[in-house]
Amino acid sequence: MAKAKTVDARHYDVILAPVITEKSTLLSENNAVVFKVARDATKPAIKAAVEALFDVKVVGVNTLVTKGKTKRWKGKPYTRSDVKKAIVRLAEGQSIDVTTGV
């Protein structure tokens, strides 16, 4: 059994929130979990944060950036913030319950 990684306060700045959608629920059947992460987070930082916070073995990390939509408020256009998501693949037999808090 691998030694548990120590939790650093910076790990909480990397992982912002779980993404709970129909598509992410389907991915969870294949040992994958989707998180909203910081814009400047790298794949190794995301992997280290998930392994330390949830005590699981991460096999791989895929990231994507969703560009913010242009909206209107009182007739004036503005742009919503860009969002970075990480699809984290876990080792076989491991899972993360995203309905519980960290």
Swiss-Prot record:
<comment type="subunit">
    <text>Part of the 50S ribosomal subunit. Contacts protein L29, and trigger factor when it is bound to the ribosome.</text>
</comment>
<comment type="similarity">
    <text>Belongs to the universal ribosomal protein uL23 family.</text>
</comment>
<dbReference type="GO" id="GO:0005840">
    <property type="term" value="C:ribosome"/>
</dbReference>
<keyword id="KW-0694">RNA-binding</keyword>
<dbReference type="GO" id="GO:0006412">
    <property type="term" value="P:translation"/>
</dbReference>
<dbReference type="InterPro" id="IPR001014">
    <property type="entry name" value="Ribosomal_uL23_CS"/>
</dbReference>
<dbReference type="Pfam" id="PF00276">
    <property type="entry name" value="Ribosomal_L23"/>
</dbReference>
<keyword id="KW-0687">Ribonucleoprotein</keyword>
<dbReference type="GO" id="GO:1990904">
    <property type="term" value="C:ribonucleoprotein complex"/>
</dbReference>
<comment type="function">
    <text>One of the early assembly proteins it binds 23S rRNA. One of the proteins that surrounds the polypeptide exit tunnel on the outside of the ribosome. Forms the main docking site for trigger factor binding to the ribosome.</text>
</comment>
<keyword id="KW-0699">rRNA-binding</keyword>
<dbReference type="InterPro" id="IPR012678">
    <property type="entry name" value="Ribosomal_uL23/eL15/eS24_sf"/>
</dbReference>
<dbReference type="InterPro" id="IPR013025">
    <property type="entry name" value="Ribosomal_uL23-like"/>
</dbReference>
<dbReference type="GO" id="GO:0003735">
    <property type="term" value="F:structural constituent of ribosome"/>
</dbReference>
<dbReference type="InterPro" id="IPR012677">
    <property type="entry name" value="Nucleotide-bd_a/b_plait_sf"/>
</dbReference>
<dbReference type="GO" id="GO:0019843">
    <property type="term" value="F:rRNA binding"/>
</dbReference>
<keyword id="KW-0689">Ribosomal protein</keyword>
<protein>
    <recommendedName>
        <fullName>Large ribosomal subunit protein uL23</fullName>
    </recommendedName>
</protein>
